[in-house]
């Protein structure tokens, strides 16, 4: 009896211990299982968070659900779906590449799964875009780019397009534009079961800059995974300043040229007069142009009225800020002072068988007289002399130049031109017409002879008339005979 009770007690204790051990084991397993992440919905409750996977992102933050086209306009629409596995991923060595213009770039991307044509399809797309299209840091450029194509998505490569099929769907990896058709990319090889899909871009420019996206699709067309690489390019501007000479009292003018830069809208330009910023809306005009290579050239012209109270011409400075990207920029500036000239007074006369040119208020150095006769440069040298100082403008002088008249018959135009002034100023000149024909030269002598002859004839006529009148005024006498006495 006692033995039976002891056996029952041992059995009961064994059952209790076994249940306790099972309970501890279940609790430990439950505590070790991963909890579902939650997020606050903003209403005091939490909801589970479903893991998401990044697809593609273009300049407008669009995903892989956007339609894309190949070079022939055929739509290729990736179908979004949840990834089949966390391990079926695409990795690239870089997610952002920024290189100088015309640089060759290779993007190395690989998959963790062998892309068998019977199970998967891999595609490479290019989302063309222009940097700073949303919030450009530079000035707005007023030009029309006839070369550029609209931002679009292009299909560059697909493992579903074998060499035999590619002849039917068109050539991939070629961007249509006004330039001659040429291969811009070295595309991956069509290898069944491959894992490496490098893309070589032969030249990064306005056509090939953008977001490149690698898509991995399942056999049924659902999207498994994707990754994107943003490729940016830049080209530093060349700057030149030309300050134009001006006449006293006229506007001061200067032209600033910022050439061959990229990206678009990446240059901020300002003008300064003696370190004071110039009003852009009143005194500055701008023009921009884009060349066939996609680089931009900007021409800015400033024209400021002369201040009569200023003793000296002002300093004009063109300053630019060029933004290579959203965070990197550099400054450049050039300055110059315009040369101000007094307009000379030029006159030409004929004196003593020579054409004489007088120029008043000209610079004492670098200025000379050039003669042109009937639009031809004469072979006869001229004689230039300084006759004195300009009374109205100290520091300037008066000049006199003469040259013999032509001995040829007919009219001749003698044009006196003051040379030596810089380009950009008007031409200072004067002219006179002289006829050297013999009939014209003998006319004064003939006129004198005729005048003397007429005078002598008139005098003789007067004497004759006077004599006749005197004779007629005497009393008449009757003749007599000697016999009458």
Swiss-Prot record:
Membrane topology of the entry: Single-pass membrane protein
Gene Ontology biological-process annotations: adhesion receptor-mediated virion attachment to host cell; symbiont entry into host cell; symbiont-mediated suppression of host complement activation
This protein's UniProt keywords: Disulfide bond, Glycoprotein, Host-virus interaction, Immunoglobulin domain, Inhibition of host complement factors by virus, Membrane, Signal, Transmembrane, Transmembrane helix, Viral attachment to host adhesion receptor, Viral attachment to host cell, Viral immunoevasion, Virion, Virus entry into host cell
First-listed, main subcellular location of the protein, grouped into a coarse class: virion
Positions of disulphide bridges: 92-109, 256-318, 357-416, 361-390
Cytoplasmic topological segments: 469-485
Subcellular location: Virion membrane
Subunit structure: Interacts with host complement component C3; this interaction inhibits host immune response by disregulating complement cascade.
Positions of transmembrane segments: 445-468
InterPro entries documented for this protein: GA_GC (IPR001038), Ig-like_dom (IPR007110), Ig-like_dom_sf (IPR036179)
Originating species: Equine herpesvirus 4 (strain 1942)
Record: glycosylation sites: 60-61, 66-67, 72, 108, 116, 147, 220, 225, 286
Domain Ig-like per the UniProt entry, residue ranges: 237-330
Purpose of the protein: Essential for the initial attachment to heparan sulfate moieties of the host cell surface proteoglycans. Also plays a role in host immune evasion by inhibiting the host complement cascade activation.
GO cellular component: membrane; virion membrane
Low complexity bias spans: 28-72
Region (Disordered): 28-88
Membrane-side (Virion surface) residue stretches: 33-444
Region forming the signal peptide: 1-32
Family from the record: Belongs to the herpesviridae glycoprotein C family.
Protein name: Envelope glycoprotein C
